[in-house]
A protein has these predicted regions:
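Conserved acid/base catalytic micro-environments in cytosolic active-site loops
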Residues: 1, 6-21, 27, 32-33, ...
Length: 367
């Protein structure tokens, strides 16, 4: 537990210690202290503030991931600057984040505490070796990424024999894809970055993306992705016309719906103050609307994330004849959402995150 506020350290410690399966073994008051204790104590999970004296949270994450890879949850303010800093921390190797003000996590303190404990338990299941592999990805200079040759014949990443077999079966269907739809949650920012930065400028489909993320974060995240990727990426707005080579990120705190026809599809952003739907944005809602407009001409992908959001929406797509893929357990930060569609028999293919770009390009070329 890393924070320079003694009040916040006590509060988080009390919340975590309510679960008999969790124990706060020590606290750190700054980034330097955090790095030293991470190396010495080898905790399963670290909670980390961003703004601290001597060494800030972002630099502390970088050093910890280099010297003693550990699952790290960042606490962040829900501001534009807080969002940018949190995204930098995730890029440095942190796996998850939560608002520092508990009333911004949930409407009552007990629910907020329960969610924090759940997140810690989920991330504690990560092994340090897997964390080291996940943390090796770092964003490259945006100019380098933008200057890479745009081509649909990008070098193929190897896939297993069963994966190649399933892909060849789909090719004979002659499916004409009209949309790529992606849903994700915990671990999604880095996973999306790994996938989208490898897509060429002339990518032939529009892309919709649903990432569980607070309202204050999605605009900063979309802007960050846009600087790193060759395709155009923006936070979705009502009235946006879906265009090839453009990716639309659902805004936090709202729902993203597709209207119109597959050749004239537009986005509609809905305010959602109800308690009926837990996730805002919801993968199920966006995927369900994609099924109505695009039918089976969708390639749907469920990436790393906690829970089962996306399972019902993927089933609706699948029933229309769409193709559904999921991220494999090994490369997931949390194997929840991908597991849900896999166990339900909805997903046709499980891939490591690094394998998605080439597999997507092959699939949409051949149908």
């Amino acid at each position: 537990m890393v924070d320079d506020s003694s009040f916040f350290r006590r509060r988080v410690t009390d919340i975590l210690n309510k679960d008999p399966n969790l124990e706060v073994i020590d606290v750190a008051i700054n980034g330097i202290d955090a790095v030293e204790k991470a190396i010495a104590l080898k905790p399963d999970v670290i909670t980390m503030d961003i703004e601290m004296p001597l060494l800030n949270g972002i630099e502390a994450v970088k050093q910890i991931m280099a010297k003693a890879p550990t699952a790290i949850i960042m606490f962040s303010s829900l501001t534009h600057d807080g969002a940018k800093a949190t995204l930098e921390a995730l890029d440095a190797g942190a796996l998850d984040f939560l608002p520092k003000k508990f009333n911004e996590i949930a409407k009552n303190t007990e629910d907020a505490g329960s969610l924090l404990r759940q997140r810690v338990i989920q991330l504690a299941r990560k092994k340090s070796g897997r964390l080291a592999r996940i943390s090796t990805f770092r964003s490259r200079d945006s100019r380098e990424l933008k200057s890479q040759t745009s081509t649909l014949t990008s070098k193929a990443t190897s896939v297993t024999r069963s994966e190649r077999s399933q892909t060849s079966i789909r090719k004979s269907s002659g499916k004409q894809y009209k949309l790529l739809a992606i849903g994700t949650s915990t671990g999604g920012p880095v996973a999306l970055q790994k996938l989208l930065t490898q897509l060429p400028e002339d990518f032939p489909l529009p892309i919709i993306m649903v990432q569980h993320m607070p309202a204050a974060f999605t605009l900063a995240f979309a802007k960050r992705l846009n600087t790193l990727c060759k395709i155009n990426i923006k936070q979705a707005e009502s009235g946006d016309v879906l265009k090839p080579g453009c990716a639309y990120l659902a805004p936090g705190g709202k729902q993203m719906i597709i209207d119109g026809t597959e050749n004239a599809a537009k986005l509609r952003i809905l305010e959602d103050d109800s308690e009926r739907i837990a996730f805002k944005p919801s993968v199920d809602i966006s995927f369900g609307s994609a099924a109505k407009v695009f039918g089976g001409n969708v390639l749907g992908i469920i990436l790393t994330g906690m829970g089962a959001d996306g399972r019902d929406g993927s089933r609706l797509l699948k029933n229309k004849g769409a193709t559904i893929w999921a991220q494999d357990e090994e490369s997931c930060v949390v194997y929840g959402m991908p597991q849900a569609v896999t166990v339900a028999g909805i997903s046709e293919l499980s891939l490591a995150i690094e394998s998605f770009p080439s597999a997507i390009l092959k699939e949409i070329q051949h149908g």
